[in-house]
Regions:
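Interhelical loop/hinge segments that connect adjacent transmembrane helices in multipass membrane
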Residues: 1-8, 185-189, 203-246, 289, ...
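Membrane-interface helix-capping segments at transmembrane helix termini in multi-pass transporters
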Residues: 2, 6, 39-45, 77-87, ...
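Signature of the first transmembrane helix
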Residues: 7-72, 101-105, 170-171, 230-260, ...
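Hydrophobic alpha-helical transmembrane segments
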Residues: 18, 160-210, 230-231
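Alpha-helical transmembrane segments of polytopic membrane transporters and translocases
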Residues: 43-59, 88-92, 191, 198, ...
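Helix-loop junctions and terminal segments of transmembrane helices
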Residues: 60-76, 152, 211-212, 268, ...
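Alpha-helical transmembrane segments of multi-pass membrane transport and lipid-handling proteins
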Residues: 88-115, 176, 201, 306-358
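Membrane-interface junctions at transmembrane-helix termini in multi-pass inner-membrane proteins
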Residues: 138-163, 175, 186, 207, ...
Length: 379
């Protein structure tokens, strides 16, 4: 138990180093991107990217399932069979990426061009952004098993370094955006897709080099696939609810109020994502130990991790959220050159929601570890 606590502390520190670096650059790049694109184009990118993200209802459940099963197999020790599970997960995610591509290029394309609300002169740019967003999304879907393996093996140093490379490339994007004379919205979407492909290759090469269990033999194992899909069937309910809540609201706001309101909500979520990094990185360090403790039959140790994780997650987020909740207009004006209307109310609402959600993060992981997710997802 003591050794596990030290490992969690070490991994948390590594992830916090990653987070502080990425948060500082992300907040700066958000400011420059908003100023360079303008409120309307920034809102267009957020709503189109969010619309593509709605297809994560298909892949989102598999993400948590992959992380759970790889951690579980490692926790079983010599009895575990990580190699066949990893190969099966890769094949499943490639298949899911294909489904997303078909749906996005048919139903998605129709809905984007006939039901959503964009300025008439920006529909060409909107469609380019849509295509590049699909590429980015599918690449990220295929990357899931590789990311899950790095987290399950608790190689947080690698995870931190790759994230720093990613955010540095995004800083370069901002520079290219400022000096470029082409359509900046299209260029921004293209460069983000290029970064996604680059990071996917880095994760793949790392896993092949350092994890002998992460070499694909391209043989689908029905037993692992059936087990994962059984787990996912109930998780799908939670994914539908989550995606509908987050991205459905974005689409409704666009249809009734236009892209400028999407920009306000997008800024609020930029701040939320930065603050959530404190909680997510802490829970990311704890999650593999929770699953491994359950797999090893150490339930008392697992419960202790769940209780402590829930308490510390809430307190950490509260510590950083409280000043922003109190002084929201002042902080936004200090950060941005031009603050979109309604950003203050959006930011306060998402922070209050995040504080409530932070209590359940490690609890969800314990449910995933046990495999008994039906009742939780129904609630």
């Amino acid at each position: 138990m003591q050794q596990n606590n030290k490992r969690i502390a070490k991994n948390t520190l590594l992830l916090y180093f990653r987070m502080l670096f990425t948060m500082a650059i992300s907040l700066y790049t958000s400011r420059v991107v908003l100023a360079t694109l303008g409120i309307e184009d920034f809102g267009i990118y957020n709503v189109v990217g969010g619309f593509v993200a709605m297809f994560s209802v298909i892949s989102g459940s598999m993400t948590s399932a992959t992380q759970r099963f790889i951690s579980y197999e490692i926790g079983k020790g010599e009895e575990g069979n990580v190699s066949t599970l990893f190969t099966t997960a890769v094949i499943i995610h490639i298949f899911l990426g294909g489904i997303v591509l078909i749906l996005a290029e048919t139903i998605g394309l129709w809905f984007l061009n006939t039901q959503m609300n964009f300025p008439e002169n920006r529909y060409v740019a909107v469609n380019w952004v849509f295509q590049f967003s699909i590429i980015t999304f599918i690449v990220n879907v295929i990357s899931v098993p590789y990311n899950a393996a790095i987290i399950a093996y608790e190689r947080m140093k690698a995870f931190a370094y790759v994230s720093i490379i990613e955010v540095t490339l995004k800083l370069l994007i901002v520079y290219l955006l400022v000096i470029s004379s082409v359509d900046k919205l299209i260029l921004y979407a293209f460069l983000l897709a290029l970064v996604a492909v680059t990071i996917r290759l880095v994760y793949g090469l790392y896993c092949k080099r350092y994890f002998t269990d992460c070499h694909c033999n391209w043989i689908y194992h029905k037993s692992h696939g059936a087990e994962m899909f059984s787990f996912v069937s109930w998780n799908l309910i939670g994914s539908v609810a989550s995606v509908t809540k987050e991205q459905g609201i974005n689409i409704v706001l666009n249809i009734f109020f236009g892209a400028s309101v999407n920009a306000a909500r997008g800024i609020a979520y930029q701040v939320l994502n930065a603050l959530n990094g404190f909680v997510n990185n802490f829970q990311l360090a704890m999650n593999p130990q929770i699953v491994k403790s359950y797999a090893a039959g150490e339930k008392e140790a697992m419960f202790q991790l769940v209780y402590k994780g829930s308490k510390f997650s809430y307190l950490m987020l509260l510590l950083f959220s409280l000043p922003i909740l109190i002084e929201t207009p002042f902080i936004l004006n200090l950060w941005l050159e031009e603050v979109p209307q309604y950003t203050t109310i959006f930011l306060r609402l998402v922070l209050i929601t995040a504080l409530i959600d932070s209590l359940s993060g490690t609890l969800i992981t314990s449910m995933h570890a046990s495999g008994r997710v039906r009742n939780y997802q129904l609630i």
